[in-house]
Amino acid sequence: MRAYLDLLQHILDNGGDKGDRTGTGTRSVFGHQMRFDLSKGFPLLTTKKVHFRSIVIELLWFLKGDTNVKYLQDNKVTIWDEWATAEQTARFGRPEHELGPVYGHQWRNFGATKNADGTYNQDGFDQIKWLINEIKTNPNSRRLIVSGWNPNEAGQVALPPCHTLFQFFVQDNKLSCQLYQRSADVFLGVPFNIASYALLTHMIAQVCGLGVGDFVWTGGDTHLYANHFEQAKLQLTREPLPLCQLKLNPEVKDIFDFKFEDIEIVGYESHPAIKAPVAV
């Protein structure tokens, strides 16, 4: 994954320093693209260890349409904890652990009506179910899009969706995906996002009877936080290792039937993890 290291170097060398919502400060570029051929290996970063289990559990959580972090915490995944404290959720009139209309809600219940107590009815549009059917029945469509960004609700959550929109493309019986990420925390978030959407592409390809093509990552505000510069420089001293392979249970034919046990990576080798603080 040399392209990722090239992005780190590009931001350090050419990015502009600016303030940000968290008060940490960033060095940013606007508009960047990376392409990964999924047939040549699974794009899980090797120049630092990435916790694949957290990526899988989070994606299954999204696909469930869940917005409460209890499922994550029950599975010992803590990546959303900073935004699910009582202090954070109280800002939006929600109980501790309830994030509101974040990814899972938008994917599975977009535009749902809201009750007086702040809960949502299950009367929204299921974008994932629609997408799967459309790929199966109309693979040449240029409308194979899922949006996590609902402008009417973006201000009602502690962290509005960063990876906002993704589109699929079928050619030669292979499924490709492009993600647009409005805000890209390149050191901590982007390695997770690349692997998560590559995994989703494999899963959807399997249930639609397709092979895999490319995953294209496109970033808007593409940045390194100021307190990640030294970690990025350390990572740039490391040579990428061969990519691992993804193995899915071939018996799973429905996207909503996947369980953690159905998903594994084979041959993952990496350099040691590099710790860095999360900006909230």
Curated annotation (Swiss-Prot):
PROSITE patterns assigned to the protein according to its UniProt record, in alphabetical order: THYMIDYLATE_SYNTHASE
Pathways per UniProt: Pyrimidine metabolism; dTTP biosynthesis
Keywords: Cytoplasm, Methyltransferase, Nucleotide biosynthesis, Transferase
Methyltransferase recorded as keyword: yes
Positions of the catalytic residues: C162
Record GO cellular component, one term: cytosol
Gene3D superfamilies membership: Thymidylate synthase/dCMP hydroxymethylase domain (3.30.572.10)
Binding site for (6R)-5,10-methylene-5,6,7,8-tetrahydrofolate: H51, D185, A279
The EC number(s) this enzyme carries: 2.1.1.45
Pfam families: Thymidylat_synt
MF terms in GO: thymidylate synthase activity
HAMAP family: Thymidy_synth_bact
Sequence similarity: Belongs to the thymidylate synthase family. Bacterial-type ThyA subfamily.
Subunit structure, as described in the record: Homodimer.
Function: Catalyzes the reductive methylation of 2'-deoxyuridine-5'-monophosphate (dUMP) to 2'-deoxythymidine-5'-monophosphate (dTMP) while utilizing 5,10-methylenetetrahydrofolate (mTHF) as the methyl donor and reductant in the reaction, yielding dihydrofolate (DHF) as a by-product. This enzymatic reaction provides an intracellular de novo source of dTMP, an essential precursor for DNA biosynthesis.
Protein name: Thymidylate synthase
Gene: thyA
